[in-house]
Structures are given as structure tokens and as C-alpha cells.
Design a protein with these regions (language model features):
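Intrinsically disordered, low-complexity segments enriched in serine/proline and basic residues
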Residues: 2-3
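Acidic, metal-dependent phosphodiester-chemistry machinery of nucleic-acid enzymes
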Residues: 11
Length: 310
């Protein structure tokens, strides 16, 4: 069990959601187990699998054992671990249905923007986060996000998704969150993209910022954050930071064992800066950075220094 935003949530459960539109016939034969509210019910499929179903009025005047009309089903939530189903049902039952709807719409929007699959846990974690953020707002307890600047710079698409969520919440609920909350939501999306824990995502973001600060200090220059080369550097640093937590390294896949030495000769300043980054990572995190990694980073640093304003 993990303490998540003041609630006990088992993040080890395998959680997934299926759009009914993509599995229409799988919804046939669902029978009500328990009505959670007018728009959410727990149900049992013909094969005995317990699910949670969302749809406008799907629980209205329904009772245990009744078959759910297919046309009322909008979403079907399935947990691969049956013992964890109660946990999700309790979460859904404890919040107004519009908050689950908002979370689901934000996730669907994120999938479209990013054009990639997200970790299924996002339905659990983001719903809980939005619900808790609203509760804090109602209690006049608003907190800033110390990583706002970094999230804006490093995760632009995810931050845009966060602002979409804030706009949706304001339109639906009349609650206007500060932009810090967009950054918090963005970090949840990043978690789901790379299947990392929130603590790791925060640390990865700080590593990227620390490396950029080191680069700025080494070259005594400001980086052009609007350039394509800067975007490529951020992407490279993001994967480098993620490898710290997966204990992975980049090995030479060029077929040229002399690649690092060649880069050192061609880009000596960038290579030395890259070695400073290597020393920082190895000293701070105990993660070994290969010479190939040093060389690839040096190439990105050269691009950043020479390709401004792309």
C-alpha cells in the first residue's frame, strides 16, 4: 500500500479501462451488482468478471440483478486484480460523478494530444488528485508548485493538457485553479507516459534542471529555449534521467568503438562539459554514465550552442 495524497491506494494493482465504443458487444449481458450513484454502477459480466460502468443515468431506478441497457453505457472500467475492485468503487462512490467525468475527459484528451498509450493507473491517480485538489480549494488550502517553471519548459504538451483540465474544471464547476495546478496535473500525465512513480518524475525534472544549470554555468551562456536543438536536448536529458532510475546505460550501437574519442576531438569543449555532467550524475546518484552517453550528450550540447533561434 502507498500513501497517495492522504489516501491509501495500492499502486501495484493492474488497472485498465476500455472504451465501450471499441468493444460494444463485450458490454452485453452486464447485470447490476450495486448502484454507486445515478451515473456509476458496479456490475458483473456474463463470465463473472466484476466491472464498474459509467453512463448518464445508468444507475437511475436500477436494482441488483437488472441488466444494463447497452445504449446507456459510456465507459467500462475493469481491474485485472479482482481484490482491488472495492478500492476503486470506494473512490468513485466518495466523489461527485462530475469529477470522475472530468478526469476521464482529460485523459482522453491527453491520449489524443500525445498520440500514445498511458499507464492505466492514470484513471485512479488523476481522479484522486483532481478530487483532492477540489477539496483543498473548497477549504481555501491552495499550494504552489515549485516545479512550475520546469514543467512548463520540459513538458510543454503535458502542461497544455494541464491547462485544458483547468479550463474544463472552471467551465464545469466554476473553480478557477492557479496555473500551479496545471503543472501538477501535467506531472501525473508524465507519470502515465513513462510509467514512473510521482517521486521519480519530480526527481527526473530536477535532474534536468540541474544539468541545464550546469551547462549554462560552464559555457556562461543562456540557452535558447525556443530552438529545436534545445527541445532535442531536453528530450535527451529526460531519457538520461529516466535511465538513472532503471539502471540502464547507452552502449555503443554505432559499430564504431572510436566514436567517443572522435567526438572529443571534434567538440572538445562540449565533451568536457558533458564529462562534468557525468561526474555530477555519478557522484549524486551513483549511476554510471558510459562514454557513449557522454559523446551523445556532447553532440546535443554542440547543437544547442550553434543552432539558436531555429
Amino acid at each position: 500500500m502507498s500513501r497517495y495524497l492522504g489516501r491509501d491506494i495500492d499502486l501495484r494493482l493492474v488497472f485498465f479501462i476500455i472504451d465501450v465504443e471499441s468493444e460494444r458487444y463485450g458490454a452485453l449481458g452486464m447485470r447490476i451488482d450495486r448502484v454507486i450513484n445515478n451515473n456509476v454502477v458496479s456490475a458483473v459480466e456474463e463470465n463473472g468478471t466484476e466491472v464498474v460502468v459509467m453512463g448518464k443515468g445508468v444507475g437511475f431506478q436500477m436494482r441488483h440483478g437488472m441488466t444494463i441497457p447497452e445504449e446507456q453505457i459510456e465507459k467500462v472500467f475493469r481491474l485485472d486484480n479482482p481484490s482491488s475492485m472495492d478500492q476503486f468503487k470506494n473512490l468513485v462512490a466518495s466523489l461527485p460523478p462530475e469529477r470522475l467525468q472530468i478526469s476521464t475527459e482529460v485523459i482522453q484528451y491527453a491520449k489524443g494530444v500525445l498520440n500514445k498509450k498511458l499507464s492505466p493507473n492514470i484513471y485512479l491517480t488523476l481522479t484522486d488528485h483532481i478530487n483532492f485538489a477540489i477539496e483543498r480549494f473548497q477549504e481555501h488550502m491552495l499550494f504552489g508548485n515549485p516545479l512550475l517553471r520546469e514543467v512548463r519548459a520540459f513538458y510543454k504538451e503535458e502542461y497544455m493538457i494541464g491547462t485544458f483540465a483547468l479550463d474544463l474544471i472552471e467551465r464545469r464547476l466554476g473553480i478557477a485553479f492557479p496555473v500551479d495546478e496545471a503543472a501538477s496535473i501535467a506531472l501525473h500525465i508524465v507519470n502515465a507516459e513513462y510509467n514512473t512513480k510521482m517521486r521519480d518524475t519530480i526527481d527526473i525534472t530536477r535532474i534536468i534542471q540541474d544539468v541545464l544549470d550546469l551547462v549554462r554555468e560552464y559555457f556562461q551562456m543562456e540557452l535558447d529555449e525556443t530552438s529545436l536543438s534545445y527541445e532535442r536536448l531536453i528530450t535527451h536529458l529526460r531519457f538520461l534521467a529516466q535511465r538513472i532510475y532503471t539502471s540502464e546505460t547507452i552502449d555503443d550501437d554505432t559499430g564504431l568503438s572510436e566514436f567517443p574519442g572522435m567526438i572529443e576531438q571534434i567538440y572538445p569543449e562540449e565533451y568536457q562539459c558533458s564529462r562534468k555532467v557525468k561526474e555530477y550524475i555519478e557522484k549524486t546518484y551513483g549511476h554510471q554514465v558510459s562514454e557513449e552517453e557522454v559523446a551523445y550528450l556532447a553532440v546535443h550540447l554542440k547543437r544547442v550552442r550553434t543552432q539558436k533561434g531555429e
